[in-house]
């Protein structure tokens, strides 16, 4: 009977724990204070088009906050809310100077990370964590965000970080009044806003192209989640296998089905921060529009015409032609509007929006350097997200 009673009590305790979405681990130091904070991450917005990436993919459903004194984690609390987490309240911690608040949002195994318990981790251990680019984090639900405060002082009692003036009582400690802690996305985004096909006269009577698919090529596989630069490793992913060329990485999985999709305006992908440095085997990220090159809208090439197009480098043996855009690359035919543009790198929290004008046949080696005069114009912009509008013309 006693065993049954204890078993039922245990079940009741488990049920109560399962319903509690504010999970606070026991601090590893004696506590005499609590910290509450609010965050600033932009307005949540849902995708309304199946292929589109929106500028305001900022919804937070899970937020872990940690208080550090040097390397020691003095407090930790996780809050989950399907409708959006904007604050964490009552983190138990110890008073003192030079405290740092570190937050990680939307971090779990579905977001490309491990199912990690942050409890007891040193500051260096948290900052050393990495994530992978996965199919799951092509959903805005799993866009990881991170933030870190400057050093501040916690006083005994109740502390509020980033709250407006007048919060709490006169005995409470207001820190960074009105300046909510900023969190930013670890991912970047790239999308094709539109493709305009207007073949020049020397091509228009012999070639026809209509966009069919969009693919991400040479996309970084891993990323740090903290640091001035998040670029990590030399492993890459791609959505379609093409003939290897100068930019093709040594460590490359180019058969990733979710990095290709049917062409539509605003189609794109969430990607990782990356840097282009040839000497260090670091390659440029490419957003590629491709499809069948034909003689006319209703007529395929004859075998002789196909052979000639392949020999010219316009398409592969299946008549597929590619229009690659090196994202945020400082190259011929690329123009930009906005900030952080033409840097030969992909930066976190930037959305690279590409407009493409096609004036002639593409290439059969999209992972190779573009000719000095290619049939491509690219235009790009930057806001926050930060949006980079890039325009390219393929001549």
Curated annotation (Swiss-Prot):
It holds the Pfam family P_gingi_FimA. It is found in: Fimbrium; Cell outer membrane. Residues 1-18 form the signal peptide. One of its GO terms (molecular function) is structural molecule activity. Coiled coil: none annotated. Synthesized as palmitoylated lipoprotein precursor. Efficient export to the outer membrane and integration into fimbriae requires lipidation and subsequent proteolytic removal of the lipidated propeptide. Disulfide bonds: none annotated. Keywords: Cell adhesion, Cell outer membrane, Fimbrium, Lipoprotein, Membrane, Palmitate, Signal, Virulence. InterPro entries: FimA_C (IPR053878), FimA_N (IPR029141), Fimbrillin (IPR008110). Residues 19-40 form a propeptide. One of its GO terms (biological process) is cell adhesion. Its main location: other. Gene3D superfamilies: 2.60.40.3690. GO terms for cellular component: cell outer membrane; pilus. A lipid is attached at residue 19 (S-diacylglycerol cysteine). A lipid is attached at residue 19 (N-palmitoyl cysteine). Residues 385-394 are annotated as: Important for oligomerization and fimbrium assembly. Belongs to the bacteroidetes fimbrillin superfamily. FimA/Mfa1 family. The name (major fimbrium subunit) does not indicate the abundance of the protein, but is derived from the greater length of the major fimbriae. In strain ATCC 33277 and strain 381, major fimbriae are 300 - 1600 nM in length and about 5 nm in diameter. In contrast, minor fimbriae are only about 80 - 120 nm long. This length difference is observed only in a small number of strains, including strain ATCC 33277 and strain 381, and is due to a loss of function mutation in FimB, a protein that restricts fimbrial length in other strains. Fimbriae are composed of a major, structural subunit (FimA) and the minor components FimC, FimD and FimE. Head-to-tail oligomerization of FimA molecules mediates assembly of the fimbrium stalk, while the minor components probably form the fimbrium tip. Linear, head-to-tail oligomerization of FimA is mediated by a conformation change, facilitating the insertion of a C-terminal beta-strand into a groove in the N-terminal domain of the following subunit. This is Major fimbrium subunit FimA type-5. It comes from Porphyromonas gingivalis. The lineage of its organism: Bacteria, Pseudomonadati, Bacteroidota, Bacteroidia, Bacteroidales.
């Amino acid at each position: 009977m006693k065993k049954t009673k204890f078993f039922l009590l245990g079940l009741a305790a488990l049920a109560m724990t399962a319903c509690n979405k504010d999970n606070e681990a026991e601090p590893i130091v004696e506590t005499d204070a609590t910290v509450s904070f609010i965050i600033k991450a932009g307005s949540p917005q849902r995708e309304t088009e199946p292929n589109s990436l929106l500028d305001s993919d900022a919804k937070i459903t899970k937020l872990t906050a940690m208080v550090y004194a040097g390397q020691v984690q003095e407090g930790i609390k996780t809050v989950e809310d399907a409708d959006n987490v904007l604050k964490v309240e009552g983190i138990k911690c110890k008073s003192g100077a030079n405290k740092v608040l570190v937050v990680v949002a939307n971090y779990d195994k579905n977001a490309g990370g491990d199912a990690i318990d942050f409890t007891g981790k040193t500051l260096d251990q948290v900052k050393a964590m990495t994530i992978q680019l996965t199919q799951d984090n092509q959903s805005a639900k799993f866009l990881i965000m991170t933030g870190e405060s400057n050093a501040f002082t916690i006083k005994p009692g109740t502390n509020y970080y980033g709250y407006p003036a007048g919060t709490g009582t006169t005995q409470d400690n207001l820190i960074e009044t009105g300046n909510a802690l900023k969190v930013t996305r670890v991912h970047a985004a790239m999308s094709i806003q539109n493709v305009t096909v207007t073949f020049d006269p020397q091509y228009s009577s012999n070639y026809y192209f209509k966009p069919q698919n969009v693919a991400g090529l040479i996309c970084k596989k891993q990323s740090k989640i903290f640091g001035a630069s998040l670029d990590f490793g030399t492993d890459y992913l791609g959505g379609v296998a093409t003939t290897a060329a100068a930019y093709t990485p040594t460590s490359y999985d180019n058969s990733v089905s979710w990095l290709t999709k049917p062409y539509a305006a605003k189609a794109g992908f969430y990607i990782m921060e990356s840097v282009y440095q040839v000497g260090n085997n670091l390659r440029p990220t490419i957003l590629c529009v491709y499809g069948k090159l034909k003689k006319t809208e209703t007529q395929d090439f004859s075998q002789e015409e196909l052979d000639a197009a392949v020999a010219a480098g316009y398409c592969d043996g299946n008549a597929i032609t590619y229009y690659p855009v090196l994202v945020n690359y400082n190259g011929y035919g690329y123009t930009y509007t906005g900030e952080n543009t033409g840097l030969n790198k992909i930066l976190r929290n930037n959305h690279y929006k590409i407009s493409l004008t096609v004036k002639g046949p593409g290439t059969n080696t999209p992972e190779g350097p573009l000719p000095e005069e290619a049939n491509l114009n690219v235009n790009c912009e930057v806001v926050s997200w930060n949006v980079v509008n890039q325009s390219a013309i393929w001549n």
